[in-house]
Amino acid sequence: MPSLKLTRRKIDSIPFLKPTLGSKKNQEFYRDLALPGFGLKVTKISKLFIVEKRINGILHRSTVGKYPQITPEQAREIAQETLYKLAKGIDITA
């Protein structure tokens, strides 16, 4: 999983996934260098901000929002709040 500081310019430069014959890869993740646990999921048709944290060996991942509907800065703030809730043991799926 590549790591980079998620900015508008960098996100715009990341291409959507192209379907290739025989490939089962349908998504790619990019981690943010500024906020551990925050990242971008790229598919064939969308770029989604995600937050993820491993708790007791189980990976918890949630979608923060879709780019460009929300900016990287807005998504980073939401992700920071979500990571805080996860650290406190609050269920983010409720």
Task: Label each PLM-derived region with a short phrase.
Residues M1-A94:
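Basic/aromatic DNA-contact patch characteristic of tyrosine site-specific recombinases
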